[in-house]
């Protein structure tokens, strides 16, 4: 019986060309692929036939089933299994024409299609499909015209029906490490993947990770029946973090070399290991001396690691000499390991060459045997024996030539170029280019950026990401590390980047200690001076004045929250125009989600307001929210998919609905006011940085405009009046609601810079 646990569908385009497919398949089979389907939508029939013959020879030798997609005549001619889609040869006709000993698979997009083929087979007496490909699980770039996504629950429902009829099933479309374990708890028999393996730098490693993640026996029911020892044994080959080895020199001050590599590996979610090639006496001012231990000691270090630990990826840094390069190359060629990323350390910051001609030539030879090379602009020029590029296009052209002649992926890094952008790019051997936008950070503290990017890249590739996705993540992470480098205060020269800033920021954001104003003792609320406590951080002078003593007291109580908002990365980058567009788009999407619920809260206030004037104003505000929401969708989100509210957005809107529907009027007004007041204050502050070329000019104009400012003043006045008329207990509750809403406001702004960091290799 065929093992469908890991079913690979080939794609010559994703694989870098038809000539690369067989090599990818061979590697993937070594990693655990159990079924291979030849799918090629772009080549002519003769090319497909030739590819089928090549893969048949390979798969027969490896004992793996080969399936051909769509081509019934080729399947019959070569004795291959066949897979057809809903728009191909009708199933019953294909089953009758295909020899009985060959398996026939069918794409199923919904339950009706499965019921239909079961009924057709019963009516005609034709055998049921041997296997069905159910999907898509999620939207996928490899089949943009696919049916609507089913989700894991939809897959499970269809697979259960198939199982009842003795039909095997695999999940396809948007399948990867991120959902493999979840799919393993459904009745499906396997995972069907395309890009997860076809674009992987190491197909074998990618396949192994998928096989490890997909444990069909570990359903929620059976897990409870297994002992803890059995569970530990079952997952012994599923490490919690990719194991990444750095082979490089040292930096005692920690900014470069193995010290930077280990920080970068940890930042990327990996477990870092290191083998030292050279001991370097350097600091932020430069290199003083270099001591290279005997090669026998280097070999002993390598033996110590490889004899004991599985190495999921390797980052190569400073190798120093031709002998060292040759030894490392020999070692890598004779030992099992994951993808190799080579950072060709050849040029010092001063411009001096660090390697002699023989060592440079050895590095060029080594490049043929690694998966990714990450030279800076001067190093790329040396590798190509050319003058340094002065534009990104020139650098990409050099990289295309080197990638083609050395059959490796080259990362072009724009840091040494000039201009506002310091983009990075993936250049594949087939000449294809994937460019990652990256705004330049103006700092002299950039020591070790090359080491850091390469180590991060290796970690993300080891975690199962494509090189393109790995570069996107690493570029974004390193940009943040550069933006906060000046605050590290390490050394008096060109200091290091802040490798740990993202981790510290995320740790702080995850803190669950109740907010300070909720832990503080309740005040008596008798006066404006006794219903809340001033913040330990002085509040800035308000641009929109409080309407009286109560709202002034609330403003003075918010100093720490306001400071947190104003100094956040989101607000800082929004103001200077360096905010990444994906982060702004996410923010706008969540703002639209928020306004739909905020409108409900304002409408509720209209229904319980104590006077007709307030009722009318709240009702008008509620209507304006819906207008603004619609305008956000029209202006900023046209053509973009609208997502669901994040947990941060829901926490805020649920809080507002709860305060306005279950608490007194004054408490509800206090809860909704920070959205007005803080937004307007921030809008006026950011307006000072606005200009005609600002990428977010229109948004900044919206929240600093006179109409919004006037609405804010009116809302402040309504709260002041409500607090004047409220009882002491109501005032204290209202103050807490105002401060809680202000914290929610801070979290709402900050969430965009927390979005999109988790990748398939993260837990």
Curated annotation (Swiss-Prot):
Residues 550-763 are annotated as: Thiaminase-2. Pathway: Cofactor biosynthesis; thiamine diphosphate biosynthesis; 4-amino-2-methyl-5-diphosphomethylpyrimidine from 5-amino-1-(5-phospho-D-ribosyl)imidazole: step 3/3; Cofactor biosynthesis; thiamine diphosphate biosynthesis; thiamine phosphate from 4-amino-2-methyl-5-diphosphomethylpyrimidine and 4-methyl-5-(2-phosphoethyl)-thiazole: step 1/1. Residues 245-500 are annotated as: Hydroxymethylpyrimidine/phosphomethylpyrimidine kinase. Keywords: ATP-binding, Kinase, Magnesium, Metal-binding, Multifunctional enzyme, Nucleotide-binding, Thiamine biosynthesis, Transferase. 2-[(2R,5Z)-2-carboxy-4-methylthiazol-5(2H)-ylidene]ethyl phosphate binds at residues 140-142, 174, 194-195. 4-amino-2-methyl-5-(diphosphooxymethyl)pyrimidine binds at residues 37-41, 69, 107, 143. The keyword Cytoplasm does not apply. GO terms for cellular component: cytosol. Transmembrane segments: none annotated. Coiled coil: none annotated. Its EC number is 2.5.1.3, 2.7.1.49, 2.7.4.7. Its cofactor is Mg(2+). Pfam families: Phos_pyr_kin, TENA_THI-4, TMP-TENI. GO terms for molecular function: ATP binding; hydroxymethylpyrimidine kinase activity; magnesium ion binding; phosphomethylpyrimidine kinase activity; thiamine-phosphate diphosphorylase activity. Residues 1-210 are annotated as: Thiamine-phosphate synthase. GO terms for biological process: thiamine biosynthetic process; thiamine diphosphate biosynthetic process. Condenses 4-methyl-5-(beta-hydroxyethyl)thiazole monophosphate (THZ-P) and 2-methyl-4-amino-5-hydroxymethyl pyrimidine pyrophosphate (HMP-PP) to form thiamine monophosphate (TMP). Catalyzes the phosphorylation of hydroxymethylpyrimidine phosphate (HMP-P) to HMP-PP, and of HMP to HMP-P. PANTHER family: HYDROXYMETHYLPYRIMIDINE_PHOSPHOMETHYLPYRIMIDINE KINASE THI20-RELATED, PHOSPHOMETHYLPYRIMIDINE KINASE. This is Thiamine biosynthesis multifunctional protein ThiED.
């Amino acid at each position: 019986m065929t093992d469908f646990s890991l079913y690979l569908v080939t794609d010559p385009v994703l694989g870098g060309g038809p000539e690369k497919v067989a090599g990818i398949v061979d590697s993937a089979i070594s990693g655990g692929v159990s079924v291979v389907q030849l799918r090629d939508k772009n080549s002519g029939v003769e090319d497909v036939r030739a590819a089928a013959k090549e893969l048949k020879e390979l798969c027969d030798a490896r004992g793996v089933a080969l399936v051909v997609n769509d081509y019934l005549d080729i399947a019959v001619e070569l004795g291959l299994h066949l897979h057809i889609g809903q728009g191909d040869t009708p199933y019953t006709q294909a089953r009758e024409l295909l020899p009985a000993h060959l398996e026939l698979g069918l794409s199923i997009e919904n339950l009706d299609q499965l019921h239909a083929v079961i009924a057709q087979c019963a009516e005609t007496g034709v055998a049921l499909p041997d296997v069905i490909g159910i999907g898509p699980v999620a939207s996928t770039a490899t089949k943009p015209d696919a049916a609507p996504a089913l989700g894991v629950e939809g897959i499970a429902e269809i697979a259960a029906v198939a199982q009842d009829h003795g039909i095997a099933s695999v999940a396809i479309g948007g399948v990867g490490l991120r959902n493999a374990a979840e799919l393993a708890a459904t009745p499906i028999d396997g995972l069907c993947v395309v890009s997860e393996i076809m674009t992987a730098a190491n197909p074998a490693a990618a396949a192994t990770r998928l096989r490890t993640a997909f444990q069909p026996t570990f359903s929620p029911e059976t897990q409870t029946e297994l002992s803890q020892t059995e569970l530990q044994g079952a997952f012994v080959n599923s490490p919690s973090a990719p194991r990444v080895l750095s082979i490089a020199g040292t930096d005692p001050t920690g900014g470069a070399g193995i010290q930077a590599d280990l920080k970068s590996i940890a930042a990327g979610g990996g477990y870092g290991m290191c083998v030292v090639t050279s001991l370097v006496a350097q600091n932020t001012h430069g290199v003083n001396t270099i001591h290279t231990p005997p090669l026998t000691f280097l070999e002993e270090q390598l033996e110590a690691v490889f004899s004991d630990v599985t190495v999921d990826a390797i980052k190569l840094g400073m190798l120093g000499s031709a002998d060292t390069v040759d030894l490392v190359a020999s070692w890598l060629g004779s030992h099992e390991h994951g993808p190799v990323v080579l950072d060709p350390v050849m040029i010092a910051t001063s411009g001096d060459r660090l390697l002699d001609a023989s060592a440079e030539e050895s590095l060029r030879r080594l490049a043929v045997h690694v998966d990714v090379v990450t030279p800076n602009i001067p190093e790329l020029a040396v590798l190509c024996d050319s003058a340094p590029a002065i534009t990104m296009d020139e650098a990409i052209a050099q990289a295309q030539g080197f990638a083609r002649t050395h059959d490796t992926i080259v990362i072009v890094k724009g840091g040494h170029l000039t201009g506002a952008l310091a983009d990075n790019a993936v250049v594949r051997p087939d000449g294809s280019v994937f460019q990652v936008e990256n705004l330049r950070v103006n700092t002299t503290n950039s020591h070790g950026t090359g080491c850091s990017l390469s180590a991060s890249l290796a970690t993300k590739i080891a975690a199962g990401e494509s090189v393109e996705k790995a570069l996107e993540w690493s570029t974004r992470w390193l940009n943040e590390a550069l933006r906060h480098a000046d605050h590290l205060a390490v050394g008096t020269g060109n200091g290091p980047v802040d490798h740990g800033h993202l981790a510290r920021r995320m740790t702080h954001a995850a803190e669950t200690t109740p907010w300070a104003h909720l832990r503080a003792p309740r005040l008596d609320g008798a006066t404006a001076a006794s219903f809340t406590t001033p913040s330990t951080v002085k509040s800035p002078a308000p641009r929109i004045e409080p309407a009286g003593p109560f709202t002034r007291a609330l403003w003075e109580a918010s100093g720490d929250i306001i400071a947190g908002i104003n100094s956040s990365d989101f607000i800082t980058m929004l103001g200077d125009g360096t905010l990444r567009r994906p982060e702004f788009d996410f923010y706008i999407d969540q703002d639209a989600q928020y306004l739909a619920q905020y409108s409900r809260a304002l409408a509720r206030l209209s229904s319980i307001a104590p006077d007709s004037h307030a009722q009318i104003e709240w009702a008008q505000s509620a209507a304006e929210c819906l207008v603004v929401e619609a305008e956000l969708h029209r202006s900023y989100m046209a053509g973009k998919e609208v997502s669901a509210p994040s947990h941060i957005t829901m926490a805020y809107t649920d809080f507002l609905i709860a305060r306005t529907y279950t608490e007194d009027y004054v408490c509800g007004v206090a809860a909704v006011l920070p959205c007005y007041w803080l937004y307007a204050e921030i809008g006026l502050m950011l307006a000072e940085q606005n200009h005609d070329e600002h990428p977010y000019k229109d948004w900044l104009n919206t929240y600093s405009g006179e109409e919004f400012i006037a609405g804010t003043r009116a809302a402040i006045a309504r709260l002041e009046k409500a607090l004047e008329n409220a009882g002491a207990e109501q005032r204290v509750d209202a103050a807490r609601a105002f401060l809680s809403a202000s914290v929610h406001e801070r979290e709402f702004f900050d969430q965009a810079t927390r979005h999109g960091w988790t990748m398939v290799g993260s837990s």
